[in-house]
Amino acid sequence: MQCTICHRPSTVWYCAHCVNTSPKLILRYKLELTQICEEVTEMRDIVTSTLENAISEKEGLLGKHMERLQHLRLKRYNARLSHRARELEQHLDSKLSRRDGLRRALKQLSPDVAVVPAEDPDEYRELRHKLTLLQNVVSMKSTQKFEELCQWFVFTCSTTEDDHFPYSIRFIPVCNIRNWRLLSTAQESLQHMCEFVIYASRALLVDIPFGSHSEKLTTDHIAAVSHFTVNLLTILIKRKRLQERPDVPDLLGRYDIDGLLYLLCSGGDVESITGTCPPTYKVVHEFVRTALEDGDQSEERGHWMVLE
């Protein structure tokens, strides 16, 4: 390309044949390409090393940004789980309200209404069939919600063969009465267990005596353990997993509260001998108080060792 005034070339052009065959052009471009490739490889190694150090050591500005990004991801995941839990709770509340309304309607029925099925057996059989289908759907949904609840609380059996605390909930050991003083996070573990039992009662549509966790129970661990135990035994009895009059000392001595909670989540049946009275709060509280006080006395005599 030449200038229209001075007729001097303003841009140097090469044809394709000369570019591909001229030693001067090929050598220069190949050297430049080789140098660029080496620089790209070196920069890629630097970026990879910097990211690995930032992720592993979490030092420097980039490490802090990576750590913050991970925290934001976990926070978003927890927020999604919390939103899902609130939706499930609202759904269960609506089902409970509908159940209570149907129960009140059944109680308000007059004796004359009971004669209607005999007058129209076909309609009665149809209603019975619909009721059976509805009960099956409610039972299936309830079981599904309970399984999701177990996954949300991450209730697992430990693989470390720990004889004292073989189970964990939300990544901390599940406390028990027998080794209460050996666990430094017993209060936090019990709080998670109480929350789980309350949500489980709503998912399984079971009325429990203590439906809320009071703040004063955080200082009175004997009452807190007793409340949790009564609620847990109530669910097991209502779900036909435990007889109505179990012997409380034999039951807790055999399974303890962590074993009973694991059987509730895993679906196993609870074996126990028959007691003289139902597991009331008074009976459970007396056993828990005696067991924990005996543990305190054993600790004072030096028979127990507190693990830091």
From Swiss-Prot:
Keywords: Autophagy, Coiled coil, Membrane, Protein transport, Transport, Vacuole. GO terms for biological process: macroautophagy; protein transport. It is found in: Preautophagosomal structure membrane; Vacuole membrane. The keyword Nuclease does not apply. Required for cytoplasm to vacuole transport (Cvt) and autophagy as a part of the autophagy-specific VPS34 PI3-kinase complex I. This complex is essential to recruit the ATG8-phosphatidylinositol conjugate and the ATG12-ATG5 conjugate to the pre-autophagosomal structure. ATG14 mediates the specific binding of the VPS34 PI3-kinase complex I to the preautophagosomal structure (PAS). Belongs to the ATG14 family. This is Autophagy-related protein 14. Residues 3-18 are annotated as: Cysteine repeats. It is a peripheral membrane protein. Coiled-Coils at the N-terminal half are essential for autophagy. Residues 73-109 form a coiled coil. It comes from the Eukaryota. The lineage of its organism: Eukaryota, Fungi, Dikarya, Ascomycota, Saccharomycotina. The gene is ATG14. GO terms for cellular component: phagophore assembly site membrane; vacuolar membrane.
